[in-house]
Amino acid sequence: MIIEERKSHELNLESIDNDLRLESVRQNAEKLGWDHFARSVRRNLQEKHHTLEASIRLDVLGSLAFMKAHLPIDKDESLNRKIQSLADGLGENCVVAAHIGGISIKSHDVSVDIGIAEEAIVSCKIGYFGQPLFDAPEALALLKSDEFSKLRDSIAEVLSLIPKEISLSDKNACKDALRALEHVLIRDAADSSFSAINNNKYGFYSPRNELRPGRLYYIAEPMLIRVAEKEGKMHADNSHLDSLPYIEIFFVKSNKKSKLPVFNQSGEWTTFNDAKVCICIRFKHAFLFSQHTIRKLAKTVPKSPVVRSYVNFYRYATGRPTVKKNLELLTQFPNETDIQQHYNVDSSKLASDSDSLVVEMFLGDLRELPKLIETLRSEWMHASLWESIVAMCEPNQDAVKKEVRAANLELLLRRNEFNLKFDTEFGNMSMQISEKEPRRYFIRTVSQLTGDTPSSDLDNLLTEKLNSTWSIPISLTFALSTLNCRLNSLLSPLNYVKPSNPFDSDKRQQWWLGANKTHTNITVEKVKKRIVLEIGPVIEPKELVYTRQEDEELCGSLLSSFGEVDQYYVQTSTIGKTGPQPRPKREPSQLASMGMMSAELDMARNRQSMEHAMHPRPQDLRELSNLESARIQMRQSIGAAHAVGLASHQSFTSPGPMRHHPYMGGSYDSPGFYGPNIPASVPFPDAAAFGKGKQRKPRAKKQPGEEVAAPSGRGKGRKGRGAAAVGAGSGRKSSGVVGENQYGMDQMRPQLQRSYSDFQNPMNPQHMPQYAQHMQHMQQMHQMQNMQQYQQMQQYQQNQQYQQNQQYRMHMQQQQLQQQQMQSPQQQSGMNTPKSQRLTDEDSDEDVDPPRLPKPQVSAAVSRPSLPPPHQLGNPMVGYPGMPLQSPNHLPLTPSPLSAPPKPFSPEQHHFGTKMRDNAYWKEAERNIDVKPDIEKLKQQMAASSSCGPVLGTAATSSSSDPSTSGESSNATESASSAPLMKPPTTAQTPKKKLGLEATLSKLRGVQEQALQKQEQQRIQQQDSVDSTNSEQPTPQPQFSQQPGPPLAPNQVNRVMNMSNAFDDEAGSSTNTSDIKPSLASLQKSTGSIVVDPTTPGTSSNIAQPSGVMPSLKKEVEEQPPEREKEKLIVKIPKILKVDDRRDERREKERDRDRDRDRDGDRERDRYEKEDKSQREKDKKERDKERKRRDRDRTEAKKEKDSSGTREKESKKRKREKSEEKDKREPDRKKEKKEGKELSKTTTKSVLPMIPTRTLKNFRIPKKDTVDEDKKEPKDESIPGPSTSSESSTRKEVAPAPISRKESTTSSVAPLQRKESFTSQSGAFPPSEYHREPPKKKPPPISGPAQGSYSGSSNAGPISSSSRGSGNGGSRKPPVLPPPALPMRGPPSDQMYRERTGSMRGFPPSSHYHGSGGSGGSKQVASYAQGLPPGMGPPAAKPHGNSYQASQWVRPPTHRDSHSYHGMPTLGPPQISQREQPPPPPQMIPLPKENPPPPLAPPSRPHRDSRARGGGDNGPDSPEEGTLRIDDE
């Protein structure tokens, strides 16, 4: 059946399906009976896969257990089945065992033995809390009368004395305290007389028996005592005890510890136990407390009491919901001659509802019990005095109106006194009835005229009468006639609203007036116990309260526990309202609201249908069957358990008729005080403060499409905690309210998806579509995961294959190169002569030095889609940018001062880089770092080796197929270069710009350039003739022990420039350091033929040459020329820079210490990440501060850089003019160089180990004839530039010039500029939108690349870094170079580099990559085809022609991934030629979610072979064309 209107047709179908399922459950419940009802409900919930929040799930199970414990036991069942049901109701842990004499029920707290003989119960014994069994006659009577339900409820009530949810130690403490309390009460409160009940310390204690807890009677009404005395009874019997109020003492769980006494035989409480419980005082009826008394008790109680409702203390007894004006009451004395009393009560004390009806009170110490009893007696007496007036003024049922004489009395109500005013013949009088002592009132009459008491004897008489009768009207009858009060005629009874129902015993005391027949009948009637039940512990006490008057016929049934609304209480309650309280409309079920699916439910339109759909409450519950009654109560139990959904999804709505009422707990543990916001130490505020209790914060509802996108890991049915998870299950929504069906079972419950049923049962036909959809979704998710795993595996395999291919190619190239060099050493010697380079201050045109770089890290190029595939598992150094094409074994293992850290990588690269460092690089570095060289021994070895002739190996070609040998060579070379006393070669001198070196060189060139040129040419010729017979081979010989390793690995040179020269303003070119000491073995190998001069350790570097060539080191320094420059004035540089070099040496030492500290931090970073996260945060902050400091330095440098802009333009103009003549001088220059190559090669090999490469930032070549301008430029050049422009521009400015693949294989310094330009930056980068493709513009005349592009190769003579200034102010005409021999495209000219300003200086123009013979072509080559990463090519051609102006600023790209050569040593400068390209290396599949890198343009095999053979001096890949020559300027 459809019980509500929905907008969606699909929702209507589901609603019908839910109703059919619930109806099936009802039918099954009838068929199976109540024994299997809980099982049926549970199975139904599981089959429907409802998902409930954890707390609500517990509520449902608790509700089922509660129903099971309170459902009536069927009397038609067999005896064994009844006993089994009895045991089930006593707890889950009860064990039923049959023995010879009957059946026993045992649990931890109770034992019941039922004797059976001939199918009849003959005996019953019960033992509680581990005590021995005792006979239970009352229990036996119930069993014989077939009242198993009552017996079960009675035993459960006794067991509730000690809570079940506390710990075992606390439970034992409670048992001991209960025993001690009962011992004391039985001893001190055994007197059952009425006087003892009122005056004893504890009153009268009725001990606990087998069916009920102990009861403590604390007060007896005087009128009841008078009735009993008339019967001749001085002690209370059972008939009287049933009418007397009492309290029961329980223990309840608490968060605070209480003092519990320890039992002893003496009964003295000397020792106590601490337990997280508190003493609960449960009243027979709700006790009426005034706000004044509550405030006094709040100081001693550990927690707030359980309040049934907030009322007005005085108005509550009258039965009037509101009193708008003064209340008028007229007594109804029976005799006509009696003077009636007309009370006019002030309404100010009848307005506020600040008093409370308390169900349970709590104590923290049992020693406070006497004080509490005394307070209860005082409060009771005060209420009785007021109720005596109200009761005496109630008219009889058959009363008729008549005229009576009455005295007018003005009554003012207060908690401690009653103040009366009346007129007498002697004037106005006032009577004060005050409580001087607890339960002891005194009356004092005062004349308002005189202020004196008319008669003290009258006051004493009135006091005695009042304390004996507890009735103000009876006491006043003795005063009105004596004081001659003025009387008025009134009609009796007064016309005031009569209550529809008689007063309950907790509202009025009936027995003081025996003349009233109505009240006399009530005195002998048993007072019904009122039970207030909490439905669901998660609901605030005020939100769900159901009460009903207990019915004798339904006693012990389910209805007696759940209860109905008290009709009288609904009409008379004034809680939170000033007007009559009508019966409120019942709110929708909580479970139904949680199961709502439509967020657009129109509440206004459906309100009426929902109200009709709500099950009507039966008028007469006695007519209902047990099944129907249980259905109603089951709805209340289960539905209330889901009320959290309503509180969480919607605004607060009180769900029941008692929504304004706090509730009282029933016979089980109460949830706590009605107002949870009131602490125990704070007195009760007004009821208005409790209009709304603590509520859950609403949580976001699940959207309709969220379920499909739910993570597969949690499962479709898994929900988060909270209301959103409760209500929004399986595609449903929990916004809105639906009506209830007439049977109380909510038609839509949220799915219960347990661990074994995370998804709907596929065997259920109704769930097949959902299950299929879910399986399809899961299958898609698995496919996606498998695809990702496959891609990752394929990527890893390709990375491995790529590494192997690269290593094989490098190995093959080096072998071919070795063979070619062995076969034609002279040709190789002539061809590779100008491979080495020297850099001076003139190598850079910018005034910026790169900032200090952070710790060395390895790029995790895997995460960069635009990068070539990295060497993930190879040597970590392979991943460095600028790595030459060499074997992975040919790598430096000892971090030397020249090994500057590369650029910091992105966070995604961090993990990969640190792992590689820890595994290989730094661990190997630890082996040789602490070994100090033996200088004397080295000198001896060098002297001995000088006679044999030096054999120097090249840098890149020294790597062989033997990994260990290559590694040793590399170590030896690096160790030699990092020796503290080793002096770097003078030819590689790189003084800092700030030292004025450029100006000094300009002066020296202008004076001695011509003389030095001739002198050097002569010396070169001499050396060439002397060493012609034993000229050394460029490739390493098989005798590796007789030759040093490569002078310096490219990455080391790069790092040394980044560290030693790149980010210190005044740092010199000296790379000496005393902190890092290479191993002795490596020094011995590398310095076998090198002369060390220890006399000048801190000065500028000198050239170390074989001793057999020159007699002294000083002479060697003066005589060594670069192979490609015949005129140099570098000889005197060391003397000029000695003072500055010492300062540079100090700075170098500081940098070395910083580098060591950074390296140690890198080595322990992984451990820090695991051990101390806060330490990593701190380190990160320090690095941020360092980066900010560098940014500030670059910002300051930017300001100084701007001042040199004018000089740059003028200087560049002169450069272009000079570069036009370069090609003319090139042929002559080559011819001259061939004559003395061997000697220059020999000198170069000794120089290379210490070649300090310049930063090459913002590279430019100043003019030769601007000596005065050059003096000014070094000042500006030493200042670091801004992080956004100058620093970033280095990426393109310092890009390498074209170099052959053989060069990149054999050169240890050639790829230096790539690392410099791509990895030495640590600041911000400009946007990547400035990446441009090479323009289609014809390039300038072809010549060597800009100086600084290459540091030269290890097997060739050094290229003088200052040869540009060799001419005298530019007056010398340089020699003209011959044209290239092969019809192949040559490298770009330095003219082009000078013209291309900004960030692109350092890259050849687009014409270098197109066409042939240096002519511009129309075809545009992609950046990856140029040997560059994507986006690194020259900018695209503009429509108007040349893309670059002399002063044009080209912004470098933003991201490092387009600048770096991570893991791609072959991606050096562009190697595009007209020959066939070789197949490309295997590409790596990029990670998901990123774009794959563009494929590399595969160079052809013939081209690689040509490069391996050398191809001639004038080939396109020739070092002569691939390296900038400076001397012809």
Curated annotation (Swiss-Prot):
| Basic residues bias (residue ranges) | 693-702
- Regions annotated as coiled coil: 1008-1032, 1169-1202
User: Which Cys-Cys disulphide bridges does the record give?
Assistant: none
Write down any Gene Ontology CC term.
nucleus
Location(s) in or outside the cell = Nucleus
Name the residue ranges with Low complexity bias.
722-739, 807-828, 958-990, 1008-1023, 1279-1288, 1349-1365
Pro residues: which segments have biased composition? 894-905, 1375-1386, 1477-1500
Q: Which UniProt keywords apply?
A: Activator, Coiled coil, Nucleus, Transcription, Transcription regulation
Q: Where is the composition biased (Polar residues)?
A: 1051-1061, 1068-1089, 1096-1105
Q: What is this protein for, i.e. what is its function?
A: Component of the Mediator complex, a coactivator involved in the regulated transcription of nearly all RNA polymerase II-dependent genes. Mediator functions as a bridge to convey information from gene-specific regulatory proteins to the basal RNA polymerase II transcription machinery. Mediator is recruited to promoters by direct interactions with regulatory proteins and serves as a scaffold for the assembly of a functional preinitiation complex with RNA polymerase II and the general transcription factors.
Q: Can you name this protein?
A: Mediator of RNA polymerase II transcription subunit 1.1
Organism from which the protein derives: Caenorhabditis briggsae
